[in-house]
């Protein structure tokens, strides 16, 4: 299951998952962050239709953080992903609607049905999975989670301490990290996986509608990074989490019980839990090294396979 706030790198994560023979994408649950949950549903349905996978169900999740009444994307996020979340690229709406059931029920039922075979990959806020833990507390011990979020050894990207996904709902991320069995794929490794315009040019040469659309939206993302950050590429944040779900040997992990700061200027910081440092059972692991060259080669192989077919 991918849990997405479907912006540009979420769309890339969908393509990567569909091109991965190790994975079967059984559903997409939607959250907020890059866009509203409503727009994440629309974008997920549209991207799946563009890629010819209208068989994959899409579920609406929570609309805002557990401690908030509403949500709107920040001005910075709108600059990164565009007003529509896809860099202004117009992908036709899918004719099919989201599923009637909600994201939380789908997560809980899927875990019961698939057991240890299921991996849940949240690439936005942790609000949906925290709600699922409340609905079925046994889920925390049973569900394998590979989370895109957090920053253990590097600075955050919304504040000096906090990474964007964790900052959306620090309480939910804290519940996930304190209770779940989680591999955290954070900025420590995702910032090492830069995709450049040499790669998007390869997608354009495929001569397909999907290849062109993905090249256009990713170039928008790369242009933002070049103008605002001064780097000639974009980090493949969400696709790397999907890659780790398929092949954990791509990263080196540090077993460490993590928590999230919930108050003060460091609110949203992911850090080792003081009381958990001496515990032998490390419930969480943080990715601290990545074989970026091997990941990027696999990313291009898998996405070209998917984009070239449509």
What are these regions (language model features)?
Residues 30, 64-67, 234:
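Generic recognition of cysteine residues
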Residues 41-113, 282-291, 295-298, 304:
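Metal-dependent C-N hydrolase catalytic cores
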Residues 1-4, 60-66, 127-132, 196-201, ...:
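Short, mixed-charge, low-aromatic patches
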């Amino acid at each position: 299951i991918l849990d997405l706030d479907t912006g540009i790198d979420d769309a890339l994560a969908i393509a990567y998952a569909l091109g991965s023979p190790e994975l079967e994408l059984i559903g997409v649950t939607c959250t907020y962050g890059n866009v509203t949950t409503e727009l994440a549903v629309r974008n997920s349905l549209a991207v799946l239709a563009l890629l010819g996978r209208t068989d994959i169900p899409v579920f609406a999740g929570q609309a805002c953080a557990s401690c908030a009444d509403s949500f709107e994307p920040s001005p910075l996020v709108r600059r990164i992903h565009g007003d529509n979340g896809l860099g202004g690229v117009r992908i036709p709406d899918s004719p099919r609607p989201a599923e009637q059931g909600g994201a939380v029920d789908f997560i809980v039922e899927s875990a019961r049905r698939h057991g240890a075979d299921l991996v849940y990959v949240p690439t936005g806020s942790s609000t949906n999975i925290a709600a699922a833990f409340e609905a079925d507390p046994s889920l925390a011990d049973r569900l394998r989670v590979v989370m895109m979020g957090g920053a253990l050894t590097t600075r955050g990207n919304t504040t000096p301490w906090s990474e964007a996904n964790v900052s959306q709902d620090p309480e939910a991320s804290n519940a996930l990290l304190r209770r779940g069995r989680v591999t955290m794929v954070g900025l420590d490794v995702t910032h090492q996986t830069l995709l450049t315009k040499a790669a998007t040019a390869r997608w354009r040469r495929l001569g397909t509608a999907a290849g062109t659309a993905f090249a256009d939206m990713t170039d928008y993302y790369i242009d933002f990074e070049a103008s605002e950050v001064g780097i000639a590429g974009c980090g493949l944040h969400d696709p790397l989490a999907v890659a780790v779900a398929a092949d954990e040997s791509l990263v080196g992990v540090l077993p460490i019980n993590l928590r999230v700061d919930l108050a003060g200027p460091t609110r949203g910081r992911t850090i080792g839990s003081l009381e958990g440092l001496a515990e032998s059972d490390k419930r969480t692991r943080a990715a601290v090294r990545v074989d970026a060259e091997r990941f990027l080669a696999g990313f291009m192989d898998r996405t070209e396979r998917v984009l070239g077919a449509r």
